[in-house]
Swiss-Prot record:
It holds the Pfam family Fer4_7. One of its GO terms (biological process) is nitrogen fixation. Binds 2 [4Fe-4S] clusters. [4Fe-4S] cluster 2 binds at residues 38, 41, 50, 54. Its cofactor is [4Fe-4S] cluster. This is Ferredoxin-like protein in nif region. Keywords: 4Fe-4S, Electron transport, Iron, Iron-sulfur, Metal-binding, Nitrogen fixation, Repeat, Transport. Ferredoxins are iron-sulfur proteins that transfer electrons in a wide variety of metabolic reactions. The keyword DNA repair does not apply. InterPro entries: 4Fe4S_Fe-S-bd (IPR017896), 4Fe4S_Fe_S_CS (IPR017900). [4Fe-4S] cluster 1 binds at residues 9, 12, 15, 19. It comes from Azotobacter vinelandii. One of its GO terms (molecular function) is 4 iron, 4 sulfur cluster binding.
Length: 92
């Protein structure tokens, strides 16, 4: 079991203090989750604490590689609408 933090991480430190297994550390350009320490909060919390506090959509991946906070999950803006709005802005 292990989650993964990817390059879109903004190093806000929010996840470090909420990790019950102390599996998150700064290791290069962004934080890293230790695969040997990460329990995905099983037995401690119903939700993965790092993902629940992360302010960046897609910065934390589940073990299967899917985003813990997929596009639209934090903003409430459906990804289709966001893509449409971006096209409208770029067309100006």
């Amino acid at each position: 079991m292990a989650l993964k933090i990817v390059e879109s991480c903004v190093n806000c430190w929010a996840c470090v203090d909420v990790c019950p297994s102390e599996a998150i550390s700064l290791a290069g350009p962004h934080f890293e989750i230790s695969a040997s320490k990460c329990t995905e909060c099983d037995g401690d919390y119903a939700e993965k604490q790092c993902a629940s506090i992360c302010p960046v959509e897609g910065a934390i991946l589940l073990a299967d590689g899917t985003p813990a906070n997929p596009p639209g999950s934090l903003t409430g803006i459906p990804p289709e609408r966001l893509a449409e709005a971006m096209r409208e802005i770029q067309a100006r």
